[in-house]
Amino acid sequence: MKLADLSSPAFLENPYPLYETLRRQGSFVSIGPNALMTGRYSIVDGLLHNRNMGKSYMESIRVRYGDDALDMPLFQGFNRMFLMLNPPVHTHLRGLVMQAFTGRESESMRPLATDTAHRLIDDFEQKSSVDLVTEFSFPLPMRIICRMMDVDISDAISLSVAVSNIAKVLDPAPMSPDELVHASAAYEELAHYFTRLIELRRAQPGTDLISMLLRAEEEGQKLTHDEIVSNVILLLLGGYETTSNMIGNALIALHRHPKQLARLKSDLSLMPQAILECLRYDGSVQFTMRAAMDDVSIEGDVVPRGTIVFLMLGAANRDPAQFTDPDHLDITRKQGRLQSFGAGVHHCLGYRLALVELECALTVLLERLPHLRLANLDTLSWNQRGNLRGVNALIADLHS
């Protein structure tokens, strides 16, 4: 197996057959010098919780793009994001942002998420059909993260396009030269936009996420301007692309399992459990990476120091050694912890907010449009990403 397999048309349409092959081939598969891949649940879980497995983002860039890419502003910008860093720097930056994503703060966003879902449906409810991607699943999390950042909602469309163009940076397989050009231009556009916004917040601070980072800086927890810009872009990317794609993935999974959908419609109190099962079944986040900071022993194998390990979360979530009948959606499943949010010190910061948004979005949609039917279920166009997986369009007949 090689990295190029993770960018093949077959994989991007349906990664799960390749994941099955990956698990069968062993605990680890070599995909290059000092680079391994694993899709087994126990290995993924063990390495995510191992403190000797850290981040080495620029080394992962070297593995995928070569030495010449290391100085590119795009990758330098991503390297400043706390998602890519190790303690104590990671701990410092994550701590600054964490206060906005506590359980209490995330739960306080439930009324906003519910109201946003209702308002979006108000705009298309009388139509006979609608593209749920453009009219619902993409604007919902974007409006919420824009509110949290106090970003003008009129800028949401241009921001969403730029964010989508940088999202492929997080793919396991390298981008094409053209994709790299587009991603670099999009990062520059976002950096310019937020530089201007940061200057405005310095002059007139508020209670938003950007002002919070600036206040932390003023209180002695120094951040450089570039660190603030990079981490604001990370918050936008994490708060938008992951959830928007997951709303669509959940709807697809439920409609492909009509008995499960019917059960959920009959008892919406099952929604939190159903969301977790949809995340396991076909999550938008498909992989993450770790680097061995020392030799790491796990289940009889040794990951040598300096090795980059591609942890295929989507494969772990379908591992039959962990989940009974893993290729079947079961919204009452109470078996095992899903890997979709990662684990350990780099566990997804915004997972509570994501769950709130997903629960509100699907609950309101099923309440308001109980007869909704997906019209293009057999002709879906996936977004051609190995990570942040989702569809380009999701056409729904609203009153079938």
UniProtKB/Swiss-Prot annotation:
Positions bound to heme: C348
Protein EC: 1.14.-.-
Any Pfam family the entry gives: p450
Molecular function terms from GO: heme binding; iron ion binding; monooxygenase activity; oxidoreductase activity, acting on paired donors, with incorporation or reduction of molecular oxygen
Keyword Heme: yes
Reported cofactor(s): heme
UniProt entry tagged with the keyword Nucleotide-binding: no
Keywords: Heme, Iron, Metal-binding, Monooxygenase, Oxidoreductase
InterPro entries in UniProt: Cyt_P450, Cyt_P450_B, Cyt_P450_CS, Cyt_P450_sf
Enzyme class: oxidoreductase
Family: Belongs to the cytochrome P450 family.
Full protein name: Putative cytochrome P450 133B2
Protein encoded by which gene: cyp133B2
